[in-house]
């Protein structure tokens, strides 16, 4: 299933400052969210609490008190995914702009729109 921002943490996430999360921890958190429905309740609760606590360390903006651990995991992963997407969009736009400048008017052919 797609990774969605938990509505309960959307307001927090819109202004939260989250430092880049270690790739191994991101993979572990994603794997947990994919498999959590199949885990025994005690294992799910303990694993979720542990991952949420480790991910909270990357949040410079404190996560709201009482937030469910699995919502914390999802929110921080969504923030990270969205930052990655914005970075990639910026990179692609810059590359296209450089390519456009580099090829504009070559060989006496006017650039096309």
Map each language-model feature to its residues.
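Membrane-interfacial and juxtamembrane segments of integral membrane proteins
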Residues: 1-113
């Amino acid at each position: 299933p797609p990774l969605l921002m938990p509505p309960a943490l959307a307001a927090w996430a819109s202004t939260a400052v989250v430092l880049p999360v270690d790739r191994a921890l991101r993979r572990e958190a994603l794997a947990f969210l994919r498999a959590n429905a199949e885990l025994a309740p005690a294992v799910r609760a303990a694993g979720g609490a542990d991952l949420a606590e480790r991910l909270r360390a990357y949040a410079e903006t404190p996560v709201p008190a009482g937030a469910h651990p699995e919502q914390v995991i999802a929110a921080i992963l969504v923030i990270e995914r969205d930052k990655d997407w914005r970075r990639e969009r910026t990179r692609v736009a810059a590359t296209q702009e450089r390519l456009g400048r580099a090829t504009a008017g070559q060989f006496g052919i006017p650039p096309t729109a």
